[in-house]
């Protein structure tokens, strides 16, 4: 069921071919949504045809807040809410040739759209353009600080994008948009189908959005990584028998690495009665050495030595909850059950 309320912004410009519809999705984002909508109005050098906010049954008054900013509002009432449902409702209602997708907890950089459109208009084979997303409050927690580096990708043609991205509406039409059955990984899955049509996904060296992760606890960290594991398993299974078995290698690597850390830690703990603390010491030394190696390889992402080391440790230990997420998907698939949305905020 979908309710649509249209409020046309006075800032909406002409109907030029390069005009853009902005689709923002959210659920109970509150002040973060206000900051997002305010940032859109600061966009430089681009014609914005409309701003559409798609709300997934918020209880905090987000739809009214969006209307106060002049956005068109679509409220969806899915039994099993997913980001894909909101994004599809938004782009199908939009009228511009280009669609900018934003999450409601992000802040748009004023120059991103101009840079992204330049790439789109210069190469018709580019179907999606995205830039750098960074955390707005890395100082708020060690999780924010470390996971901020997860957003850093090298510029160039890539396999997939994230949720903040500029896409061609025509290509969305050819692919039927996002898969609404996925609780996570819907952007990479769509990008795999887009690339199969001969289009390119481009990551540009340009600030795109600031993001408010709001991760303050280990429980949140665990659930986020578990959701990633679920996405790896479900998306890779869809393409496992194709010419391009997307994420198949990542899925196997996650299983091996996650299994290694679990089994090695268990073996070290079990052997304590016979060997004392030596096995645990060796396990810790191995983790530190591999974390330092990963930190050195990721030094191009910037940040200080301590954050890079923690990021290196994260790159290894996150494999454990990722493995659990993959196993949860496998179990549910065997039982014929669909997993509900895994939220960490």
What do these predicted regions represent?
Residues 134-136, 150-173, 183, 189, ...:
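A recurrent flexible, glycine/aromatic-enriched loop bordering the glycosyltransferase active site
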Residues 258-331:
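Membrane-embedded multi-pass helical conduit in multi-pass membrane proteins
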Residues 38-48:
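Short, acidic, metal-binding catalytic loop of nucleotide-sugar glycosyltransferases
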Residues 107-142, 212:
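Conserved donor NDP-sugar-binding/catalytic core segment of glycosyltransferases
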Residues 77-94, 115, 159, 163:
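Glycine-rich, basic loop-to-helix element that forms the pyrophosphate-binding segment
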Residues 181-182, 188-246:
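Catalytic donor/gating beta->alpha subdomain of glycosyltransferases that bind UDP-sugars
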Residues 99:
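Short aromatic/hydrophobic "clamp" motif used to bind/position activated sugar donors
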Residues 39, 55-63, 106:
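A conserved acidic beta->alpha catalytic loop
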